Amino acid sequence: MHLIKSVKTEYRPFFILFAGALLVHLFLPLSWSDDAVFAKEASELTLAAFLNGSSRLLTDTMTYVFARHPFLWRMLNPFVLTILAVTISRLLACKNETLKNTVICISILYPAMVLVDAGFIATTVNYLWPVTCGLLCLIPLQRECRGGYTKWYAYVCCIPLLFYAVNMEQMCVILTVLFVGGFLYLCTQKKPSLYAGLQALLCLASLYYTYYLNCVGDGSRMEREISRYFPSFLQLSVWNKVELGFSSTFYCLTMDAAYASVAFLVFTLFLAVAVFRKSSKISFRITAIFPPAFTVFFVISGLLPAKAVPFLSYVTGGMHQYLVAKATYSFAPLRDLLFIAVCICVLCSIGMLMCGKQARLTAFVTLAAGLGSRMMMGFSPTVWASGYRTFHIMLLTFLFCAIMILNQNPQLFIRKEKPVEIFST
């Protein structure tokens, strides 16, 4: 207790997060789902044999090591979890640092330690760790976009981190867009960046390498997954895959009684409370309350007997069946229109809560990145089989937006503060 009191107030949430996570990790079960499979394979195979046919060499190497020595993971993962919290805090500015850090430390536990449907080791090493590495790589880019420069040791640290981050396909695409976009932006400002350019090239090369390993050749990973999870996947057009990514994402967020809908409900309730506290206009309040009300209604409807809600299958287009069987594709216009309405309401609420065009644009781009990270699963036959862990990045963007809103609306604080710039320098 004395040690905690000796730490500065704004840093105490990180200290408590690390200590609590370390204690909990000592007792986590590691013998279920993919963790059990990998533990068996790692005990029987050499590393070279384990990596045979792998498209994620670095993450699978770490999976192999931790499957053989799980105590190492129990010691290291709390450290990575804390690094993620510190990195998010570094990227986002807020006058009330203690509140910001507390919200971050509590919020990251959900995607990092609850959405672990592949097992704790497999999910964290393949999702939590790449996201953490990717966000660390964005700190120098943020600094350069704000007029700073990148020191030599940032190259030494961030290039290896990038190689690990791009082992996760979703993070590879997101980082490619961000680094290419950042490099082009700096060029337009007549400040071309060696760091952004180098990282953009590495991301593009990794993107091609990932595509080659996953999709090229007989017996590729893509072919195996199509046969196992989505036999009709090759019949889908590009438009079908985009629509599948969109509808599957919002089905899980608003209609499926599981982890993703809980996170979306909390986020939209936060938006609704903020809107109600900021404005008394009935139109704003109706817009804000629609997404959480929609989610509660359809999640509860999905738990009722089919005879009690005969309209549900018509609205969902049969999506409720895909989670437990080989997937097929169906297009339901009403379902997509409802999802679009939810999107518009969320954007309107955020737009109303953010002050200034730049702040709104930043929030919208952040949400778009999160949505895009999940929508790209429409281009994978494991769009359903991958489970809720593919929402990891999207749920973190909810957290990013929540911190932005807290910063832009001092009246939500216990102690009123003047808002500062959205992203820290």
Label every PLM stretch briefly.
Residues 287-292, 340-367, 371, 410-425:
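Signature aromatic-anchored transmembrane alpha helix within multi-pass, membrane-resident enzymes
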Residues 83-90, 136-143, 178-186, 267-274, ...:
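Transmembrane alpha-helices and membrane-interface helical segments
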Residues 56, 104-142, 325-349, 373-402:
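Membrane-interface micro-motifs in multi-pass membrane enzymes
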Residues 1-22:
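Start-transfer (signal-anchor) and selected internal transmembrane alpha helices
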Residues 143-163, 193-198:
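Short hydrophobic alpha-helices at membrane interfaces in multi-pass membrane enzymes
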Residues 25-72, 172-173, 187, 192-349, ...:
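Transmembrane catalytic cores of multi-pass membrane glycosyltransferases
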Residues 75-101, 136:
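Transmembrane-helix motifs of polytopic, lipid-linked glycan transferases
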Residues 152-180, 204:
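Membrane-interface alpha helices of multi-pass inner-membrane proteins
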